[in-house]
Amino acid sequence: MSCLVEVEHLAYAYPPGHPALRDVTFHLRHGERVGLIGPNGAGKTTLLLILAGLLEAAAGAVAVAGCDLCTAAGRRQVHRKLGVVFQNTDDQILNATVEDDVAFGPLNLGLPREAVEARVRSALARVGLGEAYRARIPFHLSAGEKRRVAIAGALALEPQILLLDEPTSDLDPRGRRELREILEGLSVTRLISSHNLEFVFETCERVLLLDEGRLCADGPAIEVLADADLMLRHGLEVPPSLAGAGRPARAATPAAAAPPHRHGTDFNATPTHA
């Protein structure tokens, strides 16, 4: 399979020079389901914003679906190739009705009304929202329903890749189960950033672990998430369903002294803590 996402030696810093990403390199192939994990401040959201063309890399190379995101033209073009679901759905559900929200993206692509209508109908069906929802006011929907509308809006673009930032953050257990079922029914490539490691294990086959802007592990989800020593070193915990499935945690080791971790990929360094 060819690579849909190519990230090479990516770096980014927020003013006045605080590094958010440091020498990050990875590739995603068509159809992969990948989880992005790490403690708060690891750089996960920054990485998603760069992949979405909303931030410009400070150094390195980034290409998504053939679009060179190191150029202004590439960052404009990539919006036709991907769908993004933000952590706070109120940041992207802004129209008067559910139908208007889901139709917003396809209309901006310049599609004829008939094609937009077909995409809206298909996207709502894929997230389990019937015709009765089309005229609903998004402000009055539950958190789970808003999440579905946001995903439908992304799917209406018919993206090659779907980026989701903390998709379970405001969902109850039932909402998380329903979201998992929706994602299981999608064939689109997806990158999911989440602190809910159980959800990542349930929905992803591969995991990238970021800490202090560095890629510290990249490998099969069950291997990365079940490694108690790795999780402990980066301030994370093994998901309950995997407890005891991997190596037990040793006594806590200072992160600055931790060796590079490998799950099929070589890493030059682990984060150094201030």
Task: List each model region and its residues.
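A short, surface-exposed alpha-helical micro-motif characterized by mixed small hydrophobic
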Residues: V200-E202
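ABC ATPase NBD Q-loop/coupling interface
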Residues: A61-Q77
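Conserved ABC ATPase "signature" region
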Residues: E114-A132
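Helix-to-loop junction immediately C-terminal to a conserved catalytic motif
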Residues: A52
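Conserved ABC ATPase signature
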Residues: I137-L141, E145
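H-loop/switch region of ABC-family ATPase nucleotide-binding domains
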Residues: S194-H195
